[in-house]
Structure formats: C-alpha cells, structure tokens
C-alpha cells in the first residue's frame, strides 16, 4: 500500500486527521457489524470519500429518509453531494459543535444511529460531546485508534483503565468488535485501529448521579495516576465520609470500579445539597 496522502484525487489533510478507508473486505465487515436497516435514522461522522457512505446508503437510505453526514472538509462536501444526491443529506461543520439531537425523531425514545471513522486527533472530546445526545441514540459504531478502544472497554485494575473508561462505561455498554490494520487505509496511519460498539443505557438502567460531579471526581482521581487516592481525592475528605462508604483511599484511581466512583459522586451530591 502506498504511503501517498493522495487518494481518488484528494489529498488527505493532517489537520482534519484524514485517513481514508480503502480495504473493501474491512468495509464489508464494518457494515455487517453495524447492520443498517432501510428507513432508520442514521448519521455518519466524517464520511471522507464515501467508502462507508456508499454501502450504508444502499442499505438504509431513501429519498424521503436520507443518510445524514457531518463533514468539515468543504472539498469533500462537494464531491459527496455530486455523487449521492438526495440520498445523502450533508451537514457542513465541525462534529464537535454539531447538535446530533436535531436529527432524532420527535419524542423521547431513542431513534438515532451514529457511525463513523472518527478523526483520531479529536476522538476523546468528540466521544464526550456525543454523551450529551445519548438519550436519543440507539447505538454508535466507531472506528478509532485501537489504544483508545482498549481504554474505553478496560476493566478496573488494568493500566488501560482511565477517566475515559469510567465516564463512558457509566453511560454505555461497549464492546470491541473488529481490529483494523493500518494497511486498510490510505495513507496508512501509524497506529492500529478498531471498531467499537456503544449502546446507551436506558433511563431506568442509569444510576441517579450528576454526571458533572462524577466527572469532577474522576478527573481529580486520575490527575496523578501513580499517587494514592488519599492524595488525589484529599480535598474531598472534609465533605465525604469515605469510611462510611467503605471506600479505601489506599488505592490508585485505576483500581476503583465505575460503581464505586458513582457511589462517591452520590455522596458528594448529598453533602453539597445539605450545605446549600
């Protein structure tokens, strides 16, 4: 596979994190994993040159219910519009600022499926942005750097377990579905890739916790990974009775389960409500 940044007459732009999927066997496997169904509301993030877009449109789109796509590169937008016409509704702009909820069906039931080969340089911020729209999402299937996927699905007590693990596992059921080697892309990235499936928990399955407080605690806990929690969470010892929670501070952040972090965040919310 050539290392050229040019593919189908388009130069991949580093600032957009562009690596175009070109392996048809991998493309077929990804589409089979997604399992698109005609008439579903689906949006693709970063369609690029349309490698996934074409088979998705063939399975899901109608003129009345097109596939949606969010694309930042205006050169690609023109090509995609010309190629797919009314079967693809393009939204020009940055996925980090896009209101994905605007594509959901009216009402509160999950109705939107989100897919994409996410730009690796913004993957974590984009995953956090997408959490905002989880209540209207059926599922998400993303191509990401393998290292990021490993962190997303990591178990407590492993080196890969991180702030990203806790915050996403609190909101989604996640599974690593496929490995994708660098030679599947043009130009080939310097890292291995993988497909992850993310299914939001239903409202009745979610713990009753303020995600802002949970994020505050988890960020503090992982701020210095090698230090014990009695140091990183020391500022909370005056407001939270860790002993009453059975929460051992003589551990590192990676050794604490998602449920335990949720329990501490709930305790913090109670103390702050009393203080008010």
UniProtKB/Swiss-Prot annotation:
Gene Ontology CC: one annotated term: cytosol
UniProt-listed Pfam families: RrnaAD
EC number of this enzyme: 2.1.1.182
Molecular function terms, GO-annotated: 16S rRNA (adenine(1518)-N(6)/adenine(1519)-N(6))-dimethyltransferase activity; RNA binding
Signal peptide annotation: none
Class of enzymatic activity (EC top level): transferase
SUPFAM superfamilies per UniProt: S-adenosyl-L-methionine-dependent methyltransferases
Catalytic activity entry: adenosine(1518)/adenosine(1519) in 16S rRNA + 4 S-adenosyl-L-methionine = N(6)-dimethyladenosine(1518)/N(6)-dimethyladenosine(1519) in 16S rRNA + 4 S-adenosyl-L-homocysteine + 4 H(+)
SMART domains: rADc
Gene3D superfamilies on file: Ribosomal RNA adenine dimethylase-like, domain 2, Vaccinia Virus protein VP39
InterPro entries per record: KsgA/Erm, rRNA_Ade_diMease-like_C, rRNA_Ade_methylase_Trfase_N, rRNA_adenine_dimethylase, SAM-dependent_MTases_sf
Keyword line: Cytoplasm, Methyltransferase, RNA-binding, rRNA processing, S-adenosyl-L-methionine, Transferase
Localization, UniProt: Cytoplasm
Positions bound to S-adenosyl-L-methionine: 19, 21, 46, 71, 94, 117
Chief subcellular location: cytoplasm
PANTHER family per the UniProt record, alphabetical: DIMETHYLADENOSINE TRANSFERASE, DIMETHYLADENOSINE TRANSFERASE-RELATED
Function description: Specifically dimethylates two adjacent adenosines (A1518 and A1519) in the loop of a conserved hairpin near the 3'-end of 16S rRNA in the 30S particle. May play a critical role in biogenesis of 30S subunits.
Family: Belongs to the class I-like SAM-binding methyltransferase superfamily. rRNA adenine N(6)-methyltransferase family. RsmA subfamily.
Full protein name: Ribosomal RNA small subunit methyltransferase A
Source organism: Burkholderia vietnamiensis (strain G4 / LMG 22486)
Gene name as annotated: rsmA
């Amino acid at each position: 596979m050539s290392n050229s940044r040019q593919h189908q007459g388009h130069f991949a732009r580093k600032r957009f994190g562009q690596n175009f999927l070109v392996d048809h066997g991998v493309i077929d496997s990804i589409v089979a994993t997604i399992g698109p169904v005609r008439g579903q509301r689906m949006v693709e993030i970063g369609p690029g040159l349309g490698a996934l877009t074409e088979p998705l449109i063939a399975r899901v789109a109608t003129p009345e219910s097109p596939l949606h796509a969010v694309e930042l590169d205006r050169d690609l937008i023109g090509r995609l519009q010309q190629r797919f016409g009314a079967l693809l509704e393009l939204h020009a702009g940055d996925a980090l600022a896009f209101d994905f909820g605007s594509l959901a069906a009216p009402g509160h039931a999950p109705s939107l499926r989100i897919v994409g080969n996410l730009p690796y340089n913004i993957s974590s911020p984009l995953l956090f942005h997408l959490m905002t729209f989880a209540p209207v999402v059926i599922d998400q299937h993303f191509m990401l750097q393998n290292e990021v996927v490993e962190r997303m699905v990591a178990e407590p007590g492993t080196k890969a377990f991180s702030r990203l693990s806790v915050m996403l596992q609190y909101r989604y059921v996640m599974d690593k579905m496929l490995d994708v080697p660098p030679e599947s892309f043009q130009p080939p990235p310097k890292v291995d890739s993988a497909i992850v499936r993310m299914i939001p928990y239903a409202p009745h399955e979610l713990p009753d916790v303020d995600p802002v407080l949970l994020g505050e605690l988890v960020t503090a806990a992982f701020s210095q990974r090698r230090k014990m929690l009695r140091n990183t969470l020391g500022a909370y010892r005056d407001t939270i009775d860790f002993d009453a929670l059975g929460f051992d501070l003589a551990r590192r952040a990676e050794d604490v389960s998602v449920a335990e972090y949720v329990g501490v965040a709930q305790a913090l919310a109670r103390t702050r409500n009393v203080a008010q």
